Amino acid sequence: MKKLGLFFILLFVFIQSPVLAHDGESELENNKKFNGIENYDVITISQPGVLYYSVTNQILESVNNLESNVTFIGRANIGLEKIIDTSNQESLETNEDYLYSLSIKTIESKYADLFYSNQITELIQKNKIIVSEFTAEQYSINVGDTLVLVGMNEVTSEIEVGEIVPDAELGWFEAVVNKEVGYQLGINRNIQAIIWDNKVTENHFVELYKNIEYKQLRVTFKDAKPNKNWVLPTALVKKYFGDFQIKEKDGTWIIVEPAWRNANIERKNMPIIGRTTCNKIMWEPLLGALNQVMEEGLQNTLSKDEFQKSGGCYAPRRINRFNAGGAISRHAWGIAIDINVKSGYHPRVVQIFNQWGFAWGGTWTSPDEMHFELRDLSPSISQTGS
C-alpha cells in the first residue's frame, strides 16, 4: 500500500497535458514570462472544465498551511453583440438574436502585475478589457472602442477596450478582464489555480495531495512539456477556418448563421466511413488519412456502423463532456470527427491521423478517445504536392 500511495503522489505531481486545452486555450502562467511571476517557483492546478468548489477550498487550505500564495484564473465564452467606436458609431453589429462568441479570461486585479506590464495591469484594474491582436483584427476592434457583451447570465454589459496585445501575452485567450468585470459577465467559474512561493519543495506537493480529495487533476511545475496532441486556440481556429455568429437553441446545441454554414459546410462520400458532413477544408487531410489507412490494410479497424449511428463531423454545439464555460466545440466548425465512438482506435490509425495534421483526444486531461481534430494543413499540402 505504501508503494501504491507513492505512485499516486508522483502521478499527481508530474502528470503532463496539452499546452493548448481542448476549448482552445493555453496557460500563459506556465510560461512564467512576465514581470513578477518569473521570480518565483510556480505550481499550476487545473482539471477538465472548471475547478470544483471542493477542490478550490482544499487548495486554499493547503496554501494557508504552507504560507504560500495563490490566485485563481477564470474563463468562459461570452457573446459579442456589437462594437461601438470612439465616434459612437456601430462598427460591428450582429444579426437579430445572433452573437459572436469570445473566450474571455478573468484575473484578480491585485495580482495582475505578476503576469502583465504595469500599463496593462493599470488598465485591467480600471475595468478595461484587454483584447488579443488576432481578435482585434478579426472584428476590427480599436483601443477606445466599446464592446457590447452578453454574459453567461444574459446580462448585457458595455466595456471599453483598454489595449490590444499579442495573443501570446494573453495565453491565447481572446481577451482578459478583472474578476469584478468577470462577475458582471456571469463568469463565476475558475479553471486554474496558480500557486507561487520563493521555493517549492516536496512539502508543497505532499500538502496538496493530502488535502485535495479529487485526484483527476492536471498539475504542472516548472517547464511542462506540451502534449503532441495539442490543439489550436479559438483565435487561430477562427483565423484559419472562419468565424460565425451563433444563435442559442437549447443550451448545448446552437444555430450557426446560415451564410457561413452554406459557404463552408458540405456533405461528401468518404472511403470507409461513407457519407459525412464537414468543413470543406477537412476533405483533403481526411481523405489522405483514410486512403493511407486503406493502403496499410487497417480499414477494418474503423467502424462505419459506429460512425453512421453516433459519430460524425459537423455538429453545431458547445462542448458538453464537462463544464466548459460555453466553449464552442470544434465540431461546430466541421473540423473534428468522431469515428469509432465505442471500440477505440488501432495505434497505427492514430499515428496516421497525426501525420495528416489531426490531433487525437485520447491523451487529453479529459480523454476523448473517439475524437480527431484538424489543427495543421501543412501535412496534407506536402503529401499531396498541391
Go through each PLM region and give its residues.
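Sec-dependent N-terminal signal peptides of Gram-positive bacterial secreted proteins and lipoproteins
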Residues: 5-21
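Membrane-interface junction motifs in transport/secretion proteins
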Residues: 22-57
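Extracellular/periplasmic catalytic domains that process cell-envelope and extracellular macromolecules
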Residues: 36-37, 123, 186-187, 327-333
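Basic-flanked hydrophobic alpha-helices used for secretion and membrane insertion
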Residues: 40, 55-56, 60-62, 77-222
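Second-shell loop/turn segments in exported
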Residues: 42-48, 125-126, 269-280, 338-344
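Active-site acidic/histidine clusters and adjacent loop/turn architecture
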Residues: 240-305
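Active-site-adjacent loop/helix surface patches within enzyme catalytic domains
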Residues: 292-332
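Catalytic cores and adjacent binding grooves of peptidoglycan-active enzymes
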Residues: 314, 321-386
